[in-house]
């Protein structure tokens, strides 16, 4: 069984409905996947937040929105950087915000190994 939580839960600092915090689950090694059906941009923000708050290291935080999610949905040709896989990648620049936090800005996108942005 996998634990799937919403990216907005991490970004907001907790559940909007009073349920368990995704960050708390991650802190205890209980978060497998981050997803979002209504704020897809929250996935990148959640990865940055988990790393900046020292809850997960970068590879583990990225895996919650890539490898683990792809594996759980049967998309075995993507989700990690490895020979023979799709090579869907993003390049991100971290921007310092006035409140002391950081925000990820997508600089480049590759789809199936071809740069599209």
Describe the residue ranges of each PLM region.
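C-terminal cap of metal-dependent C-N hydrolases
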Residues: 67, 71, 83-117
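Active-site-adjacent C-terminal substructures of enzyme catalytic domains
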Residues: 1-80, 96
